[in-house]
């Protein structure tokens, strides 16, 4: 590769254009002087649509018509992309890989797939196998092929990488690790101007899904309902939102508020006013292998974080120094962790300070972008 020619990347597929992993990867590369041309066609309408398709909706003629039109648009746009050095398929992109492999092969260019998460595991964890076991097994076959065709796979944790190696026979030399990170242009330390200092505010935000175990937070709020100084806010939507709200209503909790999704600026301000960020507490395979965006965002904001313990958490962060870990699927353990942090201001300050230091040393927007650029340059040489 000429030292005078900037790397040119084609970011390709029916990926979720607004999903943080895709959006941040594109912006990180551009910040590191990589030219990124997006070749995207929308296929998915949202979370419920993806679940409906995975549960057997892919058999309906309407979906096939939608898919055919999406891939025709994608091919048309690809024909106008021009020269590129590496083709990257964004998340989720399992169905896109065979086409991407053909197109990149015709141009003799390397293919990279940012795997992010297993849609097969997602389908299993959301119970889709009960309604359509054939569809879920088909998803597994498609995903296995999608992981074997590219020249390089990008995965966020070593635990998830081992899962792909064990389940799909992927060679370790074909995998590179790239943490999720956060958009620290927005998620950064900031003051709260509307905080009631008499209230200890515990904030959860994210998708209400099984592997996050939002019900554990509700149960912890129930255990702490007699303490007027502790309040909970849960922000977001998702398949488990109604079930979680019903559980909270059954307890008549006055210390817990559900809030719909908001724009990111308002979300950041809400987080700035929280005394502690609550992570995930489920025990599904994905919950144990991943580190969610909200964890990195909390570190970037210098906020104390409570999360369920797991191999990936213990191998990356240090309990009592950069994060506070408790037993998963255990409301009493979460309630005790909240009380510990509420009563120990020095511990909260240490978690905030050391967590932020860890983020600055390992996970900044620019550092992750440099690492991704390095992977692509090594592949292009």
Which residue stretches match the model-derived regions?
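Conserved donor-binding/catalytic core segment of Leloir-type glycosyltransferases
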Residues: 10, 194-222, 233
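Acceptor-binding helix/loop patch of EC 2.4 sugar-transfer enzymes
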Residues: 45-59, 82, 112-144, 183-185
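Membrane-proximal helix-turn-helix segments that form the acceptor-binding/catalytic region
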Residues: 72-79, 102-106, 113, 133-153
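Carbohydrate-associated surface elements
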Residues: 159, 181
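Nucleotide-sugar-dependent
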Residues: 212, 265-270, 275-299, 306-315
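Nucleotide-activated donor-binding/catalytic signature segment of Leloir-type glycosyltransferases, i.e.
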Residues: 242-269
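Conserved acidic donor-binding segment of nucleotide-sugar-dependent glycosyltransferases
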Residues: 319-320, 324-331, 340-345
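A short, well-ordered alpha-helix in the C-terminal region of glycosyltransferases
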Residues: 333, 340, 347-361
